[in-house]
């Protein structure tokens, strides 16, 4: 079993290291269900936590639908995360209550080209058909 925690602070990273967690998901604003963290904390995480590091890629807390400008911003966030030595990224794009294949695939392609793992996040909870959605996520390249 993998022991993972969502972390938004330096103290959280230190605690994750102290308690030998396997993985952290670095984000900010946990009270908003997590947003893309600053470059600074991503960089610090590299030296403070020896385990696997994933970064949340979520530019706003207005649901999980993103326009093309926001997708472009998310791609840049994925590239920045790679420069900070992360192992994977966490994101999810919906179209109403269904998976937005096109936009998720755009993000997956950027991440996979950088050898990053991709995890579909909390947006899954808003999908109408969980079983079908799980199969679809696997088919489009989420790990």
Q: Residue ranges of each PLM-predicted region?
A:
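Active-site-adjacent beta->alpha loops and helix N-cap segments on the catalytic face
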Residues: 10-15, 30-51, 68-72, 76, ...
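Glycine-enriched alpha-helix->loop->beta-strand junction motifs that scaffold or abut catalytic
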Residues: 18-24, 48-52, 85-88, 113-115, ...
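Conserved, mostly hydrophobic/aromatic
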Residues: 16, 81, 107, 121
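N-terminal entry module detector
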Residues: 1-32
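Active-site gating/metal-coordination segments in enzymes
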Residues: 75-90
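Active-site mouth loops of central-metabolism enzymes
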Residues: 1-9, 57-75, 119-129
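Hydrophobic faces of well-ordered beta-strands that scaffold small-molecule active sites
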Residues: 3-5, 24-26, 53-57, 89-91, ...
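Short N-terminal helix-initiation segments at or just after the protein's N-terminus
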Residues: 30-36, 53, 57-63, 83-87
